[in-house]
Amino acid sequence: MREKYLFTAVGRLTRTRDQRGIECPMIILGGKEYLLDLQELLLWSCLNWRIVKKEEINALYDKLSNGSGYVPSRTLDACINRMITRGLIVSGSGETEYDALYDLLSSMYIIPICDKPLLQFLTVARLVLMNRVKISIARKILRRDQKSADEKRVMDLARQALLSTAEIIRCIEMDVTSLPDSDSIMEAIYNDRETTSDNIGDLVKAAPCTKEVLVAVANLYQRKQLIFDRV
């Protein structure tokens, strides 16, 4: 059986200035800074908040770069390989798409994007009062980020500590809801002689809650509720 592959982008996009004062795109990943050229920026942007198959990357890249007039010096495949080597694009593989998704996400560290419901409500209310947005549309905006029970559990844990998907699976498997300090993390996740940060992904793959957590993480990511990081 031919292996399945899935890809996504990791890190947080920001901007900096070079020695000439020119603004440049940059990815923050694992506390390190990575400058991007235009082709790398286009490719990273195609995959950010998406989980895609290899054959889908070309179409996404062509759609984003169409009309830019930019002619890169390398092929798209060469750029993909370079970004994978730099760690800015990650891939997962497996016999099934579920296996590939687990391989992709299990080692990813989850960083929730700060959501401010009160600020969102006040902004939408202001637009309604100014007749910029209809009430029916406002209701849809405010409903957009409603989360399932599994998604809420993932976000609650991720807000307390920097955890990988596999570590969140272990927490939910052990019914852990509070992680006030590093000692509680070690006690909840690495409280036996067998579990390490290197093998936890393999150990929790068959846990009863794994599928639900994996789907929750993937859905939250594709709804732009979180980003992935590496340590």
Residue spans for each PLM region:
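A structured, charge-rich N-terminal accessory region that forms the first stable segment of a protein
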Residues: 2-6
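N-terminal ordered "arm"
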Residues: 7-49
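Long, charge-rich, low-complexity alpha-helical segments
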Residues: 34-231
